Amino acid sequence: ATFFVVGNFLQDNPDLIKQMQKEGHTVGNHTYHHPDMSQIATQETFSKELSDVEDLFKKITGKSMTRFYRPPQGKYNTENLQMAKDMGYHTFFWSLAYVDWLTDAQPSKEEAFDKLLGRIHPGAIVLLHNTSKTNGEILDELLNKWESMGYQFSSLKNLLKTEE
């Protein structure tokens, strides 16, 4: 899996970050403060949002962060995409998501399965938030159901290899 993390998640969960890396997961950049990046006009401000996450990741793990970036809320402008590219980042978006991030209004397991199973498609990049209790409860079963539907899983790193 690829986990796109923000600054406070890194600060609050250093052991989990180390575990993600140890298990071979990719940890990507979701900005330090989770702002609306489409409203950021300068390279300096944009770079700081990403470099602060990079620096904290390196402090925790001793390693450089993979240059994968996901804009908060999927908000961006064309200048932002170029800024990320100029910093050496690959920008990723999702093709399948549902409202799972509201901690006080979690979908039921049935609602989650209905949305996630009904919307899966070849080549899907699925967005699931770690703040979702429901996602934690259904993840193993969800992955098994997708596999039984004939889907296979791959990393974003492998996706990039197929494009090169």
Where are these regions (language model features)?
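Soluble non-cytosolic domains of exported or imported proteins
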Residues: 4, 11, 40-47, 74-75, ...
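Active-site environment of divalent metal-dependent phosphoester hydrolases
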Residues: 34-36, 75-78, 99, 133-135
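His/Asp/Glu-enriched short active-site or ligand-binding loop at hydrolase and phosphoryl-transfer sites
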Residues: 75, 80-119, 151-163
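Solvent-exposed, polar/charged alpha-helical surfaces in well-ordered, non-transmembrane soluble domains
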Residues: 15-18, 22, 44-51, 55, ...
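Terminal accessory/targeting
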Residues: 1-2, 122-164
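Active-site beta->alpha N-cap acidic-glycine motif
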Residues: 1-41, 45-66, 145, 158-163
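A short alpha-helix capping/helix-coil boundary motif
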Residues: 33, 58-61, 94-95, 119-123
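Structural recognition of the beta-strand scaffold that forms the well-ordered cores
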Residues: 1-5, 26-31, 67-71, 90-95, ...
